[in-house]
Amino acid sequence: LQNTTVNVGKQGLTTPWTVAVDSDGNEQTGTGILALTTVGPVTFAGAYFNQTNLDTSAVDVNGTTTGTGFDGSTSIATIGVIGTAGPVTLDAWYLDMDDTFDSYTAGAKSTFDVSGIKLGADARFASLTTDAAGSKANTMGKLVLTADAGLVDGKIAYAMTDKDGGLTALDADASTTLLGWNLNALNKADADYWQA
């Protein structure tokens, strides 16, 4: 197919819930297949991994860091749609970790220039429900605004989680949570998190 890329083998888990490349070496990887195809301004993504390093590199379903909640041989499947509309990039994703959890996320991101100042906005909603009986959805919403005027830049960010929890990512650096200096919104219930 034209405008199609297929990666097979061991690779970074390129999803909103994970970090595929990390300078400190804490990236999530898996063995499987990832396919991307672009039609006009829209890219469709699909992936299946039958083994990962999530048993040693992720935040588990209990919210603790690394090594207690996932089996590295548990399969993961994800689908996503990414599109552009003018200066805005939109995306929507669904991920299923077999017998563990289901999650979806939707986001919008944009950057533009106003009189030489680069302004940016990034909004995202994520929901994750474990497969445990009676499990309720963990949800997170965030908005990040940035400005860059040469030597001076600024950022203000807000995230909120619901009363049932904010476990919406497999890494504190993932885009389905909000990370600050030694603080994050991951696995915090009923939280309001501001960052400036």
What does each model-found stretch correspond to?
Residues 1-61, 75-89, 145-164:
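Outer membrane beta-barrel
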Residues 18-21, 61-68, 181-185:
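Extracellular loop and loop/strand-boundary signature of outer-membrane beta-barrel proteins
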Residues 25-26, 61-66, 171-176:
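Flexible, surface-exposed loop regions and adjacent strand-edge segments
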Residues 66-67, 72-77:
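Active-site glycine-rich loop that binds ribose-phosphate moieties when present
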Residues 71, 86-89, 94-196:
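Outer-membrane beta-barrel pore domains
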